[in-house]
Amino acid sequence: MFQDNPLLAQLKQQLHSQTPRAEGVVKATEKGFGFLEVDAQKSYFIPPPQMKKVMHGDRIVAVIHTEKERESAEPEELIEPFLTRFVGKVQGKNDRLSIVPDHPLLKDAIPCRAARGVQHEFKEGDWAVAEMRRHPLKGDRSFYADLTQYITFADDHFVPWWVTLARHNLEKEAPNGVATEMLDEGLERQDLTALNFVTIDSASTEDMDDALYAEELADGRLQLTVAIADPTAWIAEGSKLDNTAKIRAFTNYLPGFNIPMLPRELSDDLCSLRANEVRPALACRMIIAADGTIDDDIAFFAATIESKAKLAYDNVSDWLENNGTWQPDNEGIAQQIRLLHRICLSRSEWRHHHALVFKDRPDYRFVLGEKGEVLDIVAEPRRIANRIVEESMIAANLCAARVLRDKLGFGIYNVHTGFDPANADALAALLKTHGLHVDAEEVLTLEGFCKLRRELDAQPSGFLDSRIRRFQSFAEISTEPGPHFGLGLEAYATWTSPIRKYGDMINHRLLKAVIKGEAIARPQEDITQQMAERRRLNRMAERDVGDWLYARFLNDKAGTNTRFAAEIIDVSRGGMRVRLVDNGAIAFIPAPFLHAVRDELVCSQENGTVQIKGETVYKVTDVIDVTIAEVRMETRSIIARPAA
């Protein structure tokens, strides 16, 4: 009788439209209940039975119920699931398999089965890639997933690498393919094989893509020739190898090994500027005045070179600092090192006054055993030989940026616009509270940005610098020339690493067109998006493998009194994040470890400070002593506490 009653349908519709609803993201807790976070200010409680319908990170619409003045959310509609493709550990065997996602807030096993076409017989502890197939908010009874790829077995020593690469859907191996002969590019190559070119790299480097040669001119100015490996002499645009390189976009450098962008025959041999081997190169010749200024007369040309020495950073640095026993093979090589050192000092001085110089941070190198175990983590400070190469590369990239801009009007540029204009007033207000007065308009110009950076570098600590970092925009890859505020340069286009960066290969092809006086098409915008996305994924992969290895390395220090110096890098409501100075590991110090009485403790992300009873006790950039309280291997997180 009521089945088709229009009044009843109307009433139902009315009730539905009057019921309050909210859209937000589900945040799970370890206690079974959760919250629907609508925005930074508002969240609703989700009771444990309702949490069974959703997963941490799901974006949903929920009905809001109010009982006894307490609001709670009942999930109703799925907008975007948190999990689609994921990696995890398999549980159970035979017909009753489930998978636990490898995520700190996802603890529940999801029933699953091997997808059609997957041959592997899954066992307890196997690592796998899975894809979600069912979700309770889509009308399914429960969650369900398909296992789409076997990664590796539980006890594989190299789990951190294989799982991380699978998680980010990145290649595990070097590409196949071989280039049999050089292309006929119609380029005149200058024979520079008689000159004393040298390469300076880490001792273990095989893919040498830059060689340097310096000479002093009669008027006292220095002439620098930068010769760069020439993979585009072997790889035709649009070829299979080229398309593979385009997809990979970069060589992926992970702790312990790299996955090259090009086949190893090219990256480590045919293109690599090995000592005493004749190699094709793309070269740039520039003249540098005593004050470090680069003359406008910049020459790009194709060449043939033969590196006369494979030098290592530490050996060259020791020799220049009069330490150690290493000596250059002959006076010709010694003279090169001395001239390159002079160029480095004058260019560094020029950049200090006219551009910006990054503060030196050490690189951290994992020393690994044959089974992937971490034997040691070594902090490698950036020494004078590193700076020689860095100054030469920055000079060469600045030259390419100018030539491509003036001759073509496009290229692959690294662009950084400093501060987001929307943040300029807030930035000026923050600086004012610390006694620095800047004009909100001026700070958006390259000159104003450089001026501010120099003032910040002159501060006694990096605290204020860390406070304004959140106002900065990110560096981007663009086909349009534009300034790089971070380097303090009017334009910056890299071409010095074509073995490991696809964007540099593109710039090689553009520079060759300039050399030949030919027209060439502007690179497509989608290639810059691919490069930016790959750079992001590679960085995440490097961080993920690093987290795993740090957890392994520090596991036996948990609960001991071993002290580590640690720099505070971030403060949040829940505590502080610190970086261990000696090895670079990131650890978290929960608020209760800072002070037992919660009401007397204020952790302010906004101010970057921790106050106890109104007194600032800790602030970002402080270095404190900590001990390792706990290492959670399943989430690769390190929990520290201030040393007593």
From Swiss-Prot:
GO terms for cellular component: cytosol. One of its GO terms (molecular function) is RNA binding. Its EC number is 3.1.13.1. The keyword Coiled coil does not apply. It catalyses: Exonucleolytic cleavage in the 3'- to 5'-direction to yield nucleoside 5'-phosphates. SMART domains: CSP, RNB. It is found in: Cytoplasm. Keywords: Cytoplasm, Exonuclease, Hydrolase, Nuclease, RNA-binding. Residues 189-516 form the RNB domain. Pfam families: OB_RNB (PF08206), RNB (PF00773), S1 (PF00575). One of its GO terms (biological process) is mRNA catabolic process. It is an enzyme of class 3 (hydrolase). Residues 561-643 form the S1 motif domain. Its main location: cytoplasm. Involved in mRNA degradation. Hydrolyzes single-stranded polyribonucleotides processively in the 3' to 5' direction. Belongs to the RNR ribonuclease family. RNase II subfamily. This is Exoribonuclease 2. It comes from Salmonella typhimurium (strain LT2 / SGSC1412 / ATCC 700720). The gene is rnb.
